[in-house]
């Protein structure tokens, strides 16, 4: 088996846009067929956190949010999440912060479930997914108009999995978190 990356060398990036969080670069690479360029979105990455609660009988439920997503121009049901936009902040601390901001919860235990690349054909972004356990309620600290307008859903895990199966939940980080 040959290495599909063999013969590719990243030569240079030229920034063509710098936004509040992301930048867009034109990357130049050598390839087995010659020099190529690719548009790449550079991102600090993100976190998602799945709060799991248990009733007295041990039946699990999850806490999801529904918020407007401007890129899709509609509301999306998803796990609490956010960008890793605080330089030097530990990803688990980012997950804990997002849990408080979006659903007003504090987790006694945060466990890293997985890290994935949501769209490796266009961005270097990675998303780290955490499981939040032993959660208690605290004051919600919404940041921005989307979070202020978001709705919180407490659902039995089985119902959330049904929403994945039906396609009502289609956000990648949420599907991954619920199926893990």
Predicted regions and their residues:
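Acidic, metal-coordinating catalytic segment for phosphate/diphosphate chemistry
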Residues: 12-50
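Acidic pyrophosphate-coordinating catalytic loop
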Residues: 15-20, 70, 116-127
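Internal catalytic-core helix/loop-beta-alpha segment
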Residues: 86-114
């Amino acid at each position: 088996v040959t290495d599909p990356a063999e013969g590719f060398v990243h030569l240079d990036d030229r920034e063509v846009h710098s936004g509040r969080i992301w930048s867009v670069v034109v990357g130049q690479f050598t390839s087995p067929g010659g020099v190529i360029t690719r548009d790449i979105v550079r991102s600090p990455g993100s976190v998602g956190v799945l709060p799991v609660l248990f009733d007295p009988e041990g039946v699990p439920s999850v806490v999801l949010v529904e918020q407007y997503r401007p890129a899709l121009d509609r509301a999306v049901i998803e796990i609490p999440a956010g960008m890793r936009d605080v330089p030097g902040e530990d990803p688990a601390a980012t997950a804990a912060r997002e849990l408080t901001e979006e659903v007003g919860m504090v987790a006694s235990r945060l466990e890293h479930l997985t890290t994935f690349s949501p769209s490796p054909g266009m961005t270097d972004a990675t998303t780290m997914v955490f499981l939040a356990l032993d959660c208690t309620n605290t004051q919600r600290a919404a940041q921005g108009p989307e979070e202020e307008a978001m709705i919180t859903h407490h659902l039995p895990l089985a119902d959330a999995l049904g929403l994945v199966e039906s396609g009502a939940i289609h956000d990648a980080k949420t599907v991954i978190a619920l199926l893990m």
